[in-house]
């Protein structure tokens, strides 16, 4: 809807323009400075400027519009077009009544059944007859097992047998089945039973015993020296002994190794003996068997008076 807005002068007006005929877009206010004259006149970003001081903006370029605004010294009259504001409203049916959701807060009673009475029930054609609907039954009649293995009667018998082992004196009250000695079964079992064999002696102990017994009778057996068998070292042990040892820490080196004068070191142990400076990619010096950097090597090898130290690097 077009409306007229008057801004009292002088400049600045407090808004920014965009568009123009050179951009093939209408002149639109894109920014309002808070607290400015444009903000006091209720100008908003997005307002389309139709006229400036009575001159239409249909044929104005962006530069022409800026010149018209700069030419206004006492007041600035703008004719703007502002889009209508639409408020959201809920969708209503044709009869004018909305259909709310139906919510039932009333609790629905459920049938109570003890655990095990009807859970995971499945037809079992080869199961022994059992009262499945009995509410006192907790364990199912079969779990993919032989017929009646986990039935109620077998479980009770197993539990009773465990309790008999825990209660003292219960074995005395149990009746013992008596087998007549003159029966054929009793005689067959006892005839086929072998006599207990003598304990066997190990081969190594037998060899030691023969060595002890071969000596003279007057010499005590405890004084004879017996050598233990020597275990042969496998080929893998020799390869382990060939592992290089670090000249500084003394431990074996696995992986990267640094060699200097036929001595091996870990990369982290290849340091100066005084300042612990890592000598990798640097010059190193051996002084009295120790490894030093150039600075501390010079300090330890001071020449006599009248002589100067000259560092000689090996040729590549």
From Swiss-Prot:
Keywords: Cytoplasm, LIM domain, Metal-binding, Methylation, Phosphoprotein, Zinc. Residues 244-303 form the LIM zinc-binding domain. Its main location: cytoplasm. The modification Phosphoserine is found at residues 18, 93. GO terms for cellular component: actin cytoskeleton; cytosol; Z disc. Residues 1-84 form the PDZ domain. PROSITE patterns: LIM_DOMAIN_1, LIM_DOMAIN_2, PDZ. The modification Omega-N-methylarginine is found at residue 164. Pfam families: DUF4749, LIM, PDZ. One of its GO terms (biological process) is actin filament organization. The keyword DNA damage does not apply. It is found in: Cytoplasm, Myofibril, Sarcomere, Z line. The keyword Hydrolase does not apply. One of its GO terms (molecular function) is cytoskeletal protein binding. InterPro entries: PDLI1-4/Zasp-like_mid, PDZ, PDZ-LIM_domain, PDZ_sf, Zasp-like_motif, Znf_LIM. Interacts with ACTN2. Forms a heterodimer with PDLIM4 (via LIM domain). PANTHER family: PDZ AND LIM DOMAIN PROTEIN 3, PDZ AND LIM DOMAIN PROTEIN ZASP. May play a role in the organization of actin filament arrays within muscle cells. This is PDZ and LIM domain protein 3. It comes from Mus musculus (Mouse). The gene is Pdlim3.
């Amino acid at each position: 809807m077009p409306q007229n807005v008057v801004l009292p002068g002088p400049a600045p007006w407090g808004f920014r323009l965009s568009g123009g005929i050179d951009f093939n877009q209408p002149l639109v206010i894109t920014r309002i400075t808070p607290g400015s004259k444009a903000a006091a006149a209720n100008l908003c970003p997005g307002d389309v400027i139709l006229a400036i001081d009575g001159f239409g903006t249909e044929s104005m370029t962006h530069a022409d519009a800026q010149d018209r605004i700069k030419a206004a010294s006492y007041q600035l009259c703008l004719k703007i077009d502002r889009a209508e504001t639409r408020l959201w409203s809920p969708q209503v049916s044709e009869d004018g009544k909305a259909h709310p959701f139906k919510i039932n807060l009333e609790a629905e009673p459920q049938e109570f059944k003890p655990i095990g009475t009807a859970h995971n029930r499945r037809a079992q054609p080869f199961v022994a007859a059992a009262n499945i609907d009995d509410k006192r039954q907790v364990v199912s009649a079969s779990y993919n097992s032989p017929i009646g293995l986990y039935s109620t009667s077998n479980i009770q018998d197993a539990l009773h047998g465990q309790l008999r082992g825990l209660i003292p004196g219960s074995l005395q009250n149990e009746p013992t089945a008596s087998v007549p000695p003159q029966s054929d079964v009793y005689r067959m079992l006892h005839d086929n039973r072998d006599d207990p064999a003598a304990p066997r002696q190990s081969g190594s102990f037998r060899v030691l015993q023969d060595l002890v017994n071969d000596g003279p009778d007057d010499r005590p057996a405890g004084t004879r020296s017996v050598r233990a068998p020597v275990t042969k070292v496998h080929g893998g042990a020799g390869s382990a002994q060939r592992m290089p040892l670090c000249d500084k820490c003394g431990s074996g080196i696995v992986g990267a190794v640094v060699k200097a004068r036929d001595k091996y070191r870990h990369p982290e142990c290849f340091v100066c003996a005084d300042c612990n400076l890592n000598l990798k990619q640097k010059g190193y010096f051996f002084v009295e068997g120790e490894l030093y950097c150039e600075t501390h090597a010079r300090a330890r090898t001071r020449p006599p008076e009248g002589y100067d130290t000259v560092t000689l690097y090996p040729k590549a």
